[in-house]
């Protein structure tokens, strides 16, 4: 089985590649990552220790994935996930998040490849989320039945980042219908763990821990600066 992990030197991609390599013996894993994000070159070294090759190419370009040849499964982990960055560098975020999906799908239809696409909870409407009732007392366990699920509204404004991921989801569905491709979409929430290079705009919990270890100040913006918001962490 030949697996290509797009964004394989990122936080999720590298951990997935290493996990799969250790768990499945008869498997060929390729990482495709242009190493544009800080810390990705460190993850490339981790992959190399397990003989996982990284192809340093821009996935949004037409020929990058075609040159790799037949792939049985694409795991698409690549994206530009920062909300603030999507406001400042809109064209770049669209290229990194949407065009990469398009190139993957054009190759998948050629070889009838399966697809796992990591999307985001940011596809949901910010306006409708802000209308939800809020409370500050979480001394008792909150009601898990009041969670936001995949049926929540996605038709209103969310963010440029969320829009690129939602467009990618819809394009995958269209390709699946037209070319009978099998796919799975996971709308990830807050993800944290080893080898996450936390920054203020992405990797919140790693960033938070780093700040505490270094005894640096943290600025909370939720609930008027008190930081009382509750999030799920995977």
Please describe what each predicted stretch is.
Residues 86, 148-159, 183-197, 208-233:
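A conserved pocket-lining segment of Rossmann-fold NAD(P)-dependent short-chain dehydrogenase/reductase
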Residues 97, 101, 201-206:
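Amphipathic alpha-helical segments in well-structured domains
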Residues 118, 203, 229:
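A conserved catalytic-core signature of glycosyltransferases
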Residues 37, 197-204:
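Short acidic-hydrophobic sequence patches enriched in Asp/Glu that either
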Residues 1-189:
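N-terminal Rossmann-like NAD(P)+-binding domain of SDR-like oxidoreductases, especially those catalyzing
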Residues 202, 233-234:
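Alpha-helix initiation and capping sites
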């Amino acid at each position: 089985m030949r697996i290509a992990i797009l964004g394989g030197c990122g936080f999720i991609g590298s951990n997935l590649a290493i996990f799969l390599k250790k768990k499945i013996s008869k498997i060929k894993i390729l990482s495709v990552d242009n190493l544009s994000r800080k810390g990705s070159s460190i993850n490339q070294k981790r992959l190399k220790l397990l003989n996982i090759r990284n192809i340093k190419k821009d996935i949004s370009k037409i020929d990058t994935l075609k040159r790799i040849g037949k792939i049985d499964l694409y795991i698409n982990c690549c994206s530009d996930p920062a909300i603030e960055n999507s406001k400042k560098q809109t064209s770049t975020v669209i290229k990194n998040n949407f065009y990469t999906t398009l190139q993957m799908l054009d190759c998948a239809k050629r070889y009838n490849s399966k697809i796992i696409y990591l999307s985001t909870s940011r596809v949901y409407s910010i306006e409708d989320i802000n209308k939800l009732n809020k409370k500050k007392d979480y001394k008792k366990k909150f009601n898990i039945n009041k969670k936001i699920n995949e049926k929540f509204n996605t038709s209103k404004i969310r963010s440029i980042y969320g829009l690129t991921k939602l467009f990618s989801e819809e394009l995958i569905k269209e390709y699946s219908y037209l070319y009978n491709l099998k796919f799975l979409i996971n709308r990830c929430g807050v993800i944290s763990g080893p080898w996450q290079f936390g920054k203020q705009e992405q990797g919140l919990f790693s960033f938070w821990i780093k700040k505490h270890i270094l005894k640096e100040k943290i600025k909370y913006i939720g609930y008027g600066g008190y930081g009382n918001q509750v999030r799920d962490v995977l």
